[in-house]
A protein has these predicted regions:
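Short, hinge-like loop/turn segments at secondary-structure boundaries
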Residues: 37-40, 105-108, 133-135, 158, ...
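Phosphate-binding site of ATP-dependent enzymes
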Residues: 156-214
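Short, glycine-/small-residue-rich phosphate/pyrophosphate-handling segment
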Residues: 98-118
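ATP-binding N-terminal substructure of ATP-dependent carboxylate-amine bond-forming enzymes
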Residues: 1-92, 96-98, 102, 121-130
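ATP-grasp fold ATP-binding core
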Residues: 107-108, 132-150, 173-182
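Anion (oxyanion) recognition and catalysis
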Residues: 14, 80, 108, 133, ...
Length: 214
């Protein structure tokens, strides 16, 4: 998913104005893809690399990583430390919005209505009846901190609750159990620069599956 996002953005940026490089990050493997297709390591001290014997530094990072470390503030904090500007929101906003339960509690403080939910941490158990009494069925059981729709299950029956919890724990140390909300799903993208704020048209999310996923 992350690589597809990167390739999409790469295809739209003007190559006459910018020297573009895709950097692949997987665990401790950080590599930049050179025009030849060869991959060379990134120096994590300053996010630089060497090409044809010449050291090259980045002027800007366009973050397209779905999940950690691209959406939870870790990569943003790293770029802040070494002084490289980047796309996406800052450390605080990234960390808070990546944690679904924390984000919902924050929104509640502003009087925004959110689905009823509960948090379950690894090592603790919960009875099926507790889930049903708290959020009802159907409900969504999902990793509390996770990208895209990995580990997410729409639970319709009591028998599906524990397998869904186990699946979600495979992606995160915390699981969020959330009441199902019937309605029209919409999304609205926006971005802010030094000079302006741009809000894109509201878009309805339509899927042939049980819920929008990858």
């Amino acid at each position: 998913v992350s690589l597809r996002s990167a390739q999409g953005i790469y295809s739209f940026i003007d190559k006459e104005r910018y020297n573009l490089y895709i950097v692949e990050m997987q665990g401790n493997r950080w590599e930049v893809v050179l025009p030849s297709g060869e991959k060379t390591p990134i120096d994590r001290n300053d996010f630089s690399f060497t090409e044809n014997g010449e050291k090259k530094n980045f002027d800007f990072a366009y973050i397209t990583i779905h999940g950690t470390p691209g959406e939870n503030g870790l990569l943003q904090g790293y770029f802040d430390l070494i002084g490289i500007p980047y796309s996406s929101c800052n450390v605080l906003v990234s960390a808070m919005t990546f944690n679904k339960f924390t984000c919902n509690q924050y929104l509640k403080g502003f009087g925004i209505r959110v689905s009823e939910s509960m948090i379950l941490r690894k090592g603790f158990e919960i009875l099926d009846e507790e889930v049903i009494n708290k959020v009802g069925l159907p409900c969504f059981i999902k990793p509390n901190a996770g990208g895209s729709s990995f580990g997410v299950t729409k639970v319709k029956t009591k028998e599906q609750i524990q397998p869904a919890i186990e699946k979600a724990f495979g992606e995160s140390d915390e699981v969020m159990i959330e009441a199902f909300m019937q309605g029209t799903e919409i999304t609205c993208g926006c971005y802010k620069t030094k000079d302006k704020e741009v809000v894109f048209p509201i878009t309805e999310v339509v899927t042939s599956n049980e819920f929008f996923d990858y």
